[in-house]
Amino acid sequence: MSSIHSTAIVDPGAELDSSVTVGPYAVIGPKVRIGAGTSVGPHCVIEGRTTIGRDNRIFQFASLGAIPQDKKYAGEDTCLEIGDRNTIREFCTFNLGVPGAGGVTRVGDDNWIMAYCHIAHDCLVGNHTTLSNNTTLAGHVELGDWVTVGGLVGIHQFVKIGAHAMVGFASAVSQDVPPFMLVDGNPMGVRGFNIVGLKRRGFSADRLAAVKQMHRLLYRQGLTLEAAAKAIEELAAEHPEAAGDITLLRDFIVSSTRGIAR
């Protein structure tokens, strides 16, 4: 049987694993599903069609699954999906999706999401990301795996931030940030590549060398994006260990719709 505090309000329609714990004064709605080992802190509100995986830690006053902050939303049956082993700190707000754009806001696994972060409708957050305090994701933002975002950062709607990228404190992000890159400022600029983060993740010398060359081609050679993408693709023969990294960056560049941060 779930450990539910006597002051919590859990709708009979909610589905909670027997190992879920719910703190004082939390409110859980009828369409909510919560997996094994997840803890819900005091005063949390979890509503809408929200599915939460296992072993998540949700701290006090978080609001998950509220309707999107979109004037076009008219009560459609959209959802929020949260994976496993996430830490969601105080006063975080994650909204449902909106129809016509997939209708799903999705957060993956093993993310570290600090206090007062906002994840708006239809955002797609990967795995192993770190969102520092007061990070704000507007609608339809996509974050790749291992992205790190500093505190007080605002990310414009539809922006994509590629895997292993890092965004510095108090930046305003209005264009796509390629994988592996380090950006900072308002207006935002590319300051280099995320070498510290890549080393921490065990990137080999060959992979680091490839990322360094890709950064140079994209930002130091005066090439057009088309020419840079072609030159990056040609690095695969020289750096066989980095073939996946090269494809990741090349595909990100050619698929960008908001323009690449330069």
Curated annotation (Swiss-Prot):
Q: Where in the cell is it found?
A: Cytoplasm
**Can you say what this protein is called?**
Acyl-[acyl-carrier-protein]--UDP-N-acetylglucosamine O-acyltransferase
What EC number(s) does this enzyme carry? 2.3.1.129
Query: Which InterPro entries does its entry note?
Result: Acetyltransf_C, Acetyltransf_C_sf, Hexapep, Hexapep_transf_CS, Lipid_A_LpxA, Trimer_LpxA-like_sf
This protein's pathway: Glycolipid biosynthesis; lipid IV(A) biosynthesis; lipid IV(A) from (3R)-3-hydroxytetradecanoyl-[acyl-carrier-protein] and UDP-N-acetyl-alpha-D-glucosamine: step 1/6
Question: Which GO biological process annotations does it have?
Answer: lipid A biosynthetic process
Superkingdom is Bacteria
**Cross-referenced CDD domains:** LbH_UDP-GlcNAc_AT (cd03351)
Give an example GO cellular component term for this record: membrane
Question: How would you summarize the oligomeric state and partners of this protein?
Answer: Homotrimer.
Q: Which organism is it from?
A: Paracidovorax citrulli (strain AAC00-1) (Acidovorax citrulli)
Q: Which molecular function terms from Gene Ontology are attached?
A: acyl-[acyl-carrier-protein]-UDP-N-acetylglucosamine O-acyltransferase activity
PROSITE patterns with a match to the protein in the record? HEXAPEP_TRANSFERASES
Grouped into one coarse class, the protein's main location is cytoplasm
Function as written in the Swiss-Prot or TrEMBL entry: Involved in the biosynthesis of lipid A, a phosphorylated glycolipid that anchors the lipopolysaccharide to the outer membrane of the cell.
Task: Report the catalytic activity.
Answer: a (3R)-hydroxyacyl-[ACP] + UDP-N-acetyl-alpha-D-glucosamine = a UDP-3-O-[(3R)-3-hydroxyacyl]-N-acetyl-alpha-D-glucosamine + holo-[ACP]
Q: Per UniProt, which keywords does this protein have? A: Acyltransferase, Cytoplasm, Lipid A biosynthesis, Lipid biosynthesis, Lipid metabolism, Repeat, Transferase
Q: Which family does it belong to?
A: Belongs to the transferase hexapeptide repeat family. LpxA subfamily.
